[in-house]
A protein has these predicted regions:
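Generic N-terminal targeting/processing segments that precede catalytic cores or assembly contacts
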Residues: 1-391
Length: 391
């Protein structure tokens, strides 16, 4: 079973991710992993932290001579900014006068809830772990999941469909339009529509001028996923539930949609469900659809269409013009704490969501096809494709 955990704080020495369950013999493309980490750092509206960090994956175990060896993988990402925080956030007791307290909780952040839960007198430790910096570790191991899926012919990418009030959410963007976005070396807002992207930039510019922040919507597309991943037999095996939980787990995501789920709730069934046809030379088993409102999932199982998952991102909760809050110590009204932050992170969140979708699909693929080695897994996968072809 594919299992993963992360550790580390935003301004600590490093982030570490642990991944167990990958088969032996998977080629690890270091340049690809580092490129994924680079993609997460891009996008108009990112803060000053991204000028400090240059994330590179340092594999500590589980990978040798360029391949996985079947044992648990540990990967470390250095936090360069830690050099600026050694005295403020030491492992040992340190000098209390140099500690940087978060004295007033920020509305929308984990500050207050976390301080109450863990009995902290202020929110520094909450901020450190709840920060979206943690998602970099997920992107590193998500890149390995992408490499595994690539061996099965499956691709996972994202694009931005809304920033603030600017939206192209009513259109389905083809995979061929999304692919080039990941190859760009200059990333604006990762939208496939160039005109809409410029309007999105104007939206970010507007909130930059006012000291505010802005959210939006990204869509993750998994291309060439075979039917049969996930299951309807138990609630916790349903692929749509697994994907929703995976994407919702990302910082600032407040809603998840699969296919045209939101529109479907307001439409008659005849306008929602994807009619079925048959052409022997198409798809995995010859069955076709007139559209893909289901987002590639029916009954918790992949149906052979593209899987489409949308994440709805709230605006970042750290504002340069802070909202009203209360001082932890005095309980007196004050402005919420401010710490260097982003203004818009929708493209970066999309990359992190790619990682979560890839990890989820890789887990389901391993459960279905098994294999302690890549050779064994691919042999099992080819046998399943033959079964579908002869259905």
């Amino acid at each position: 079973m594919l299992r993963y955990f992360t550790s580390g704080e935003s301004h600590g020495e490093a982030l570490v991710a642990f991944l167990s369950g990958l088969p032996a013999g998977l080629t690890v493309d270091q340049a690809f992993v580092d490129r994924e980490l680079w993609r997460r750092q891009q996008g108009f509206g990112r803060g000053g932290r991204m000028k400090i960090e240059t994330d590179k994956a340092h594999f500590l175990s589980g990978v040798h001579h360029g391949k996985t060896i079947g044992s648990p993988i540990a990967v470390m990402l250095e936090n360069r900014d830690w050099q600026n925080w050694k005295e403020s956030l030491p492992v040992e007791t340190g000098d209390p006068e140099k500690h940087k307290r978060v004295a007033s909780p920020r509305p929308g952040h984990a500050d207050l809830a976390g301080a109450l839960k863990y009995d902290f007198t202020e929110a520094r430790y909450v901020l450190e772990r709840a920060s979206a910096r943690e998602s970099a570790a997920r992107v590193a191991i998500g890149a390995l999941a992408k490499l595994l899926l690539r061996e099965l012919g499956v691709g996972v990418l994202s694009h931005v469909i809304a920033v603030g009030a600017v939206s192209i959410a009513d259109r389905e963007i083809a995979w061929e339009q999304i692919e080039p976005l990941a190859r760009k070396n200059e990333v604006l807002l990762s939208c496939a529509d160039a005109d809409a992207e410029q309007r999105m930039k104007e939206e970010v510019d507007k909130v930059l001028r006012t000291g505010d922040s802005v959210g939006g919507v990204f869509e993750v597309v998994a291309h060439n996923v075979p039917p049969g991943l996930g299951s309807y037999v138990q609630w916790d095996e349903r692929l749509d539930a697994l994907l929703a939980a995976a994407v919702m787990s990302l910082q600032a995501v407040k809603a998840v949609e699969i296919g045209s789920g939101i529109q479907a709730a307001h439409s008659p069934g005849s306008a929602v469900h994807d009619e079925i046809g048959y052409k022997s030379d198409e798809g995995f088993a010859g069955f076709t659809r007139t559209r893909n409102h289901a987002g590639g999932l029916e009954g918790g199982v992949s149906n052979g269409q593209e899987i489409r998952v949308r994440g709805y991102l709230k605006p970042i909760s750290t504002l340069r013009r802070p909202l009203q809050s209360v001082d932890f110590a005095t309980r007196e009204p004050v402005k919420a704490a401010y710490e260097r932050s982003d203004v818009c992170v929708v493209p970066a969140a999309g990359v992190a969501a790619e990682a979560m979708v890839a990890l989820t699909l890789a887990r389901c693929a391993l459960e279905k096809f098994g294999g302690d080695s890549m050779k064994e897994m691919k042999r099992n996968f080819q046998g399943y494709l033959e079964q579908l072809k002869n259905y």
